[in-house]
């Protein structure tokens, strides 16, 4: 085709050369070697002979060969279109120059004038032939692209393979939809399970903080304060009336060192140390009333259960200290003639710097407390001994030890307590 294009251009130049060369126009004609005639139309590579390939490899090679053929034929079509455009442009230039020459110039050589219409007509015919051949080539390329020279069995294999891939794709889409639905269901189930677990934990925490109602009796529980912090504590819901004497008894177990901390404290507005029992650092256990101090000869930091009772009366500030049913100390002048003020806050496990708060972790009680009772009188020594040896179970008439009267906070907890006899065996 390129040879035909070159012949057309050469023919136009030869015809025009019979007259005087046109001013300002120069055309260069170059010979095209025969081997260049097919340079723009490379043939597809033929498969290697004598090499045994699997059907999948032959199919893959055929597809690659088809792709390369289509790409090369597209490039050839592009080059041929460019050549046609260039030839059309030159033809237009020739027509314009010939028209101007016929109007303004004369034949100075005495030759007969040329017939421009014949030249244009011949060039048009040549161009039409080129266009016809180009359209034929494009049709052939489309035919080759749609019906390649691959063997029929390869085409069947290709079609079967494409059909199989389509079916696999549809199955995969269906599987993904099923997995999506299953994942949604599993996520919902997992979310429900998580919510149930959280609700159970929340209920358990609430039970620990507010008390467990599953005790054998309302007083068969203990408060556990396992760590020395400023946020674990118990609180007695009831408050004290104005008192002129009292007896406070409790069971406790602690192995904290140094000092067991503060088993209980009672604070009123204007006096944070209205009643406090504390063992702080290496000091002995102390009883504070209205911020006045008395040291008590009690020793309870051996990790065993001990029964403690303290009596006090405003008359002469007389006090007594009992451990495990035995009186170990007595004294007087502890806040004499001072009545215990009413309306305060009673805390288990912490010393109060303000009413109901400002706890100090170094003064916190570490251990277990139970049977915390308060009476508005001084109990007789025999009563205290009977309570300690489990022969008498007597609740406080001011503050009794009952489940619904004790709240716990900050991780403190309530647990069933050992029986009185079991506590005695632990002495």
UniProtKB/Swiss-Prot annotation:
One of its GO terms (molecular function) is metal ion binding. Disulfide bonds join 249-309. GO terms for cellular component: acrosomal lumen. Testis specific. SUPFAM superfamilies: Concanavalin A-like lectins/glucanases. Glycans are attached at residues 144, 185, 389. Pfam families: Pentaxin. Ca(2+) 2 binds at residues 351, 353, 363. It comes from the Eukaryota. Residues 219-420 form the Pentraxin (PTX) domain. The keyword DNA repair does not apply. It is found in: Cytoplasmic vesicle, Secretory vesicle, Acrosome lumen. Its cofactor is Ca(2+). Residues 1-17 form the signal peptide. Binds 2 calcium ions per subunit. May be involved in binding, concentrating, and sorting soluble glycoproteins or glycolipids that are destined for the acrosome. Homooligomer or heterooligomer (probably pentamer) with neuronal pentraxin receptor (NPTXR). This is Neuronal pentraxin-2. It comes from Cavia porcellus.
């Amino acid at each position: 085709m390129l040879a035909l294009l070159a012949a057309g251009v050469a023919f136009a130049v030869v015809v025009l050369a019979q007259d005087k060369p046109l001013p300002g126009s120069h055309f260069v004609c170059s010979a095209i070697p025969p081997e260049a005639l097919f340079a723009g139309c490379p043939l597809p590579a033929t498969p290697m002979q004598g090499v045994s390939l699997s059907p999948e490899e032959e199919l893959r090679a055929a597809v690659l060969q088809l792709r390369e053929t289509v790409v090369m034929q597209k490039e050839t079509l592009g080059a041929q279109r460019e050549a046609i455009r260039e030839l059309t442009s030159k033809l237009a230039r020739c027509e314009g120059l010939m028209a101007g020459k016929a109007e303004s110039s004369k034949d100075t050589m005495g030759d007969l004038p040329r017939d421009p219409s014949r030249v244009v007509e011949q060039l048009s015919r040549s161009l039409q032939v080129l266009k016809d051949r180009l359209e034929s080539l494009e049709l052939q390329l489309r035919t080759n692209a749609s019906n390649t020279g691959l063997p029929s069995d390869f085409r069947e294999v290709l079609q079967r393979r494409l059909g199989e891939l389509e079916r696999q794709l549809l199955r995969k889409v269906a599987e993904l939809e099923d997995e999506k639905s299953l994942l949604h269901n599993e996520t919902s189930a997992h979310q429900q399970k998580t919510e149930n677990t959280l609700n159970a934990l929340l209920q358990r925490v609430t039970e620990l903080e507010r008390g467990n109602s599953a005790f054998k009796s309302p007083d068969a529980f203990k408060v556990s304060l396992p760590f020395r912090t400023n946020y674990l504590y118990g609180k007695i819901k009831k408050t004290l009336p104005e008192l002129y004497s009292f007896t406070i008894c409790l069971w406790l177990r602690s192995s904290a060192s140094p000092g067991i901390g503060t088993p209980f404290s009672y604070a009123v507005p204007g006096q944070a140390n209205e009643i406090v029992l504390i063992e702080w650092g290496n000091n002995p256990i102390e009883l504070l009333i209205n911020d006045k101090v008395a040291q008590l000869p009690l020793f309870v930091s051996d990790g065993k259960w001990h029964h403690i009772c303290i009596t006090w009366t405003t008359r002469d500030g007389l006090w007594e200290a009992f451990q495990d049913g035995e009186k170990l100390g007595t004294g007087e002048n502890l806040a004499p003639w001072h009545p215990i003020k009413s309306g305060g806050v009673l805390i288990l496990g912490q010393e109060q710097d303000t009413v109901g708060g400002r706890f100090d972790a170094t003064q916190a009680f570490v251990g277990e407390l139970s049977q915390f009772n308060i009476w508005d009188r001084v109990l007789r020594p025999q009563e205290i001994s009977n309570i300690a040896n489990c022969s008498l179970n007597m609740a406080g008439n001011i503050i009794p030890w009952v489940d619904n009267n004790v709240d716990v906070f900050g991780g403190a907890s309530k647990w069933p307590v050992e029986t009185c006899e079991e506590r005695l065996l632990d002495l």
